[in-house]
A protein has these predicted regions:
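Non-heme Fe(II)/2-oxoglutarate
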Residues: 1-67
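Catalytic core of non-heme Fe(II) oxygenases with the double-stranded beta-helix
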Residues: 43-56, 61-180, 184-192
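Membrane-proximal basic amphipathic "stem/tether" segments
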Residues: 187-213
Length: 213
């Protein structure tokens, strides 16, 4: 795994409710694009470059689209398979104090995937929690994903996919995972936005690298 100082803080919903008294970010990330990870040591670059390329592949994307067909059809209709999806894989690291309140993902996203990367089964109870929204507005817990090796989840993003994460406790050193987000990639505005975000993240990473050097 990369060193802590190779990561940078997350933003947006991924940091909601995750502040600590000392102000330290509780979720950090590494975008798994070659231009972003090029500052990693060569042995680590070789590993994460392959991981990023596989996760951005058409084969992986098509497999998720096939398995999530009911949810995608519910949102996009019968022609869901023709909706463009732009993959953005990131390596994330959460530390004690991290939490996320109940929310649904932004509709800029089409598919959300999280792949857990724990070293063992010692922290099974810190996986993502899924909720059901009842007619009275309450959102009780339906299930919780176990945070164990070779596991994770994926769902088609819609306005009923409520989920959260309980606070990561002091007994956990890091909560490592890969977030693979497929952003809806149709229409000129969405297409430009998706690529502009990648360019913007590249420049932020270069500035950060210059400050560290």
């Amino acid at each position: 795994m990369p060193d802590d100082n190779d990561y940078r803080p997350m933003s947006g919903k991924s940091k909601m409710g995750s502040s600590r008294a000392d102000g330290k970010p509780t979720r950090t990330k590494i975008d798994l694009f070659p231009e972003y990870i090029r500052h990693l040591p060569s042995d680590k670059f070789a590993v994460w470059d392959v991981v990023g390329r596989v996760l951005r592949s058409e084969e992986v994307k098509n497999a998720f689209i096939q398995h999530l067909a009911p949810g995608l059809m519910k949102r996009f209709g019968e022609n869901f398979a023709g909706v463009g999806m732009y993959p953005v894989p990131i390596l994330t690291r959460d530390i004690p104090g991290y939490r996320v309140f109940k929310h649904t993902d932004s509709l800029w996203k089409g598919i959300t995937v999280q792949l857990y990367l724990p070293a063992d089964n010692s922290n099974k109870n810190i996986g993502t929690i899924f909720h059901e929204r009842l007619p009275d507005g309450t959102k009780p817990k339906v299930t919780q994903m176990p945070f164990v090796p070779n596991s994770g989840y994926a769902f088609a993003v819609w306005n009923d996919t409520w989920h959260s994460a309980d606070p990561v406790g002091p007994e956990v050193r890091t909560r490592d995972s890969i977030l693979l987000t497929y952003f809806v990639d149709r229409g000129i505005w969405r297409t430009l936005r998706n690529r502009a975000r990648r360019v913007g993240n590249f420049f932020l990473n270069e500035l950060r690298s210059l400050k560290r050097s």
